[in-house]
Amino acid sequence: MEIPFATDWLRLPARKDGNETRLAYFRRQIILSKPPASCPILITADARYKLYVNGCFVQAGPQKAIDATAWYVDPAELAPFLRAGKNAVAVEVLYFGSDGHSSLLETRTPHLYIGDENGRLSGKSGWRCTAVDGVSFPKPQNTPSGTREDAAGEPRFSGWKTTMYDDSDWEDAVPYTLYEKLLKGGPFCLVPRTIPLI
């Protein structure tokens, strides 16, 4: 699989450079005249993602990077989950921050990459996003992962993975530009994952 120089990264518009672990939601709605026979995409995130289509779990990833020379990207086939009419693609992104596990590469805020040659879901525009304030990650003592999750249910996110959800109070996700990458570093060198998806 040949992966072009990766510039279709998205981030939250309110950049919050810091050490804390954070959770963010990204979503996009598309309208299809009929279900496609195939809808392949490439997806990865800083540092972990869970991908959903129309409320159905598709997959989680990416494979953990070994060093700063490569960031693993996953293929995903969305066609089995798509239907005629309105569709919702939703991604939960967990960012560990610099207080996270020392072997995890990181930017400075939750990031999502979507590569789509057909242009239906390209990361260049059309994505909505929000930070999730009801989930916190206090740093515990003596845990190998370096994080613990404390989650309080937020009614405002009920159904956020479905087409029925109203994301009008969310913000537009913004591109993580080449300029930012050159200035602050970032995961632009993507390589295919080397182990099977679980």
Predicted segments with their positions:
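Aromatic-lined ligand-binding clefts that engage carbohydrates, nucleic acids, or primary amines
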Residues: 30-33, 37-52, 87-91, 170
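Beta-strand-rich ligand-recognition modules
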Residues: 50-106
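Short beta-strands within extracellular/lumenal beta-sheet-rich domains
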Residues: 20-32, 71-78
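Extracellular beta-rich ligand/substrate-recognition surface
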Residues: 14-24, 62-71
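Residues that flank catalytic or metal-binding motifs in active/ligand-binding sites
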Residues: 26, 47, 72, 108, ...
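Short, flexible loop/turn elements at secondary-structure junctions
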Residues: 34, 45-47, 65, 80-82, ...
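An acidic-aromatic loop/edge-strand motif
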Residues: 1-16, 90-198
